Design a protein with these regions (language model features):
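Acidic/His-rich, metal-assisted hydrolase cores and their charged scaffolds
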Residues: 1-176
Length: 176
């Protein structure tokens, strides 16, 4: 995706799932698994997810499994890394879509029914360079499910938006 100039948009549940995905992304970056794009930016654009992440960071002894706790004992925070940017304000959120560099955007809601993810979908679904990566269950009747089921077009903010981005699901992370 990055090689073709695209971005990865991840609709994510704000509490728990976002932090789990940050953990995976930190490992990907640390291991250099995205060749030629080591310094890519990861945006977390959800006030609730940002606050939940702060709780995880501030209460590390209680929030992590043994593998993550071992990292903490080595002085490594398992969900904080270089290139991680949080967008708390509306202005910061809007600025993400003005950044034309390849990037990862984690935003709520996970099923795309509300929240800032809808703006990111509007700005990114039409572009075949991008990937929308679902990391959780998508209930019937939700926008997320429509995308996973192969919708050619969706309605966002009163406008029809063509679905040209690649739609993918990451198996094994849903709680369902």
């Amino acid at each position: 995706t990055f090689d073709r100039g695209g971005s990865v948009i991840i609709p994510s549940f704000a509490v728990g799932r976002t932090q789990e995905i940050l953990y995976f992304i930190r490992q990907i970056k640390e291991r250099g698994m995205v060749k030629g794009h080591d310094g890519f930016t990861v945006y977390v654009d959800s006030p609730l997810a940002i606050n939940a992440t702060k709780i995880f960071v501030d209460n590390a002894a209680y929030c992590y499994d043994e593998e993550a706790a071992a990292l903490l004992r080595q002085g490594v925070n398992p969900i904080v890394f270089d290139g991680l940017v949080t967008a708390s304000s509306v202005q910061e959120s809007m600025a993400i879509n003005a950044d034309d560099r390849p990037k990862v955007i984690l935003s709520a809601s996970g099923m795309c029914e509300g929240g800032r993810i809808r703006h990111h979908l509007k700005h990114n679904l039409w572009d075949p360079k991008n990937v929308i990566l679902f990391v959780g269950y998508q209930a019937v009747g939700t926008l997320g499910r429509s995308l996973v089921d192969g919708a050619d077009e969706v309605r966002l903010f009163g406008e029809e938006v063509a679905v040209r981005a690649e739609i993918l699901q990451l198996p094994g992370v849903s709680g369902h």
